[in-house]
Each structure stands twice: as C-alpha cells, then as structure tokens.
C-alpha cells in the first residue's frame, strides 16, 4: 500500500505505508489533488496499480476514469459508479476495456456472495433472467427482525444497527430504500438494461 487518502488529504510513500503512518494519518496527511497523486505514481515508475474505494462518495467516483487512464485497476465497495447516469456507467466500461483494466465490485450486492458474477455469467451464457428474488438489505432485515421480536423502540434498534456498522454511512440511504434501489439497478445493468436511478 503506497497511499492512504480521504477526500482532502493523503499519505504517500512509494516504498509502502507503515502502520505508524497509517495510525497517524490525521497528523501525517497532507492536502493533495488527483493530478498530484498520479504525478507521484508516475515519478516513481510504480506498476501493478490498484485503487480501492471504500467510500460512499460520488466525488471520488469522478476519479475513476483518470485513474484507469493512468494504469489503475479498480476495486470498489462504492455503489455510486454503477448507479449514476448510464452514460458514465458505459464510458467507465469502455475506458476499462480500452486500457485493459479490471473493475471489481462484487460487494455492491450480496455482501460477500458472488451474486453479481453469477448473474453476469448466466446472462452471458444466454440465460434469460426474468426475475431475481431475495433480501437486498441486511440493514432492513436486521431492523425489521429485531423490531418484531423485541419491545425496544425503533430508534434504539436503529442506533444499535448504526453502532454495529450494519447501515450505510448515511442510514437514511437504507431507510428510504435508496440502497436497495441501487442494488437492483446494478443487477439490472448487469443484464444490459439501461435503466436509471
């Protein structure tokens, strides 16, 4: 790992980030732009580059195209890139193909289950998928199951879900159905449907 960043600051070390640097991120991080970061990567002739996005940020998704164009493969838990406007979705895939880069996002739907890959493989093998059924929100499942089995107020159960890390960074995304909607759109687009969110 040569860099750790948030939306405004980063730590960069071409020899690898130490645990001390990581632990002291708040003190050691400096402001950066994507162009400065890419410049440092090129200056040090780094290879086998991988950008990992564990945010829920639309702003960071805007970095995907320049990262791919500068030699990065992508791994993302962020659903935004697969659910914003279809022209961006298509452009990202074209850019990945042009630069022969990979984009792994299996955790977008189904947590650790290989649901996206399975749907994609079935579709590409000629299967006509007409329906997908399941529980698409672990958060809502937890909330409803816990609420129906206890006397606790819903707000207390929600607080527990947030503290346990079950919700999206903004729990309103779960509660208003946006998270489920994004997951369903991701699966629809894997079936070559050009739907929008």
Question: Model-derived features: where do they sit?
Answer:
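N-terminal glycine-/serine-/threonine-rich beta1-alpha1-beta2 phosphate-ribose binding loop
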Residues: 1-70
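Core active-site phosphate/anionic-ligand binding loop and the adjoining beta-turn-alpha structural block
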Residues: 87, 100-197
């Amino acid at each position: 790992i040569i860099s750790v960043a948030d939306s405004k600051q980063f730590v960069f070390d071409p020899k690898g980030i130490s645990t001390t640097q990581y632990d002291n991120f708040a003190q050691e991080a400096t402001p950066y732009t994507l162009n400065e970061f890419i410049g440092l990567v090129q200056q040090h002739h780094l290879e086998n580059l991988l950008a990992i996005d564990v945010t829920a940020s639309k702003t960071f998704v805007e970095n995907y195209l320049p990262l791919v164009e500068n030699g990065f493969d992508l791994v993302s838990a962020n659903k935004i890139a697969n659910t914003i406007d279809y022209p961006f979705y298509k452009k990202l895939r074209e850019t990945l193909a042009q630069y022969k880069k990979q984009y792994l996002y299996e955790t977008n739907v189904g947590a650790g289950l290989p649901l996206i890959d399975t749907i994609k493989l079935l579709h590409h093998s000629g299967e006509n998928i007409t329906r997908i059924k399941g529980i698409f929100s672990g958060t809502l499942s937890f909330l409803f199951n816990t609420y129906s089995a206890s006397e606790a107020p819903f707000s207390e159960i929600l607080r527990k879900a947030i503290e346990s890390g079950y919700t999206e960074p903004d729990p309103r995304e779960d509660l208003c159905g946006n998270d489920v909607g994004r997951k369903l759109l991701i699966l629809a687009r894997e079936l070559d449907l050009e739907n929008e969110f």
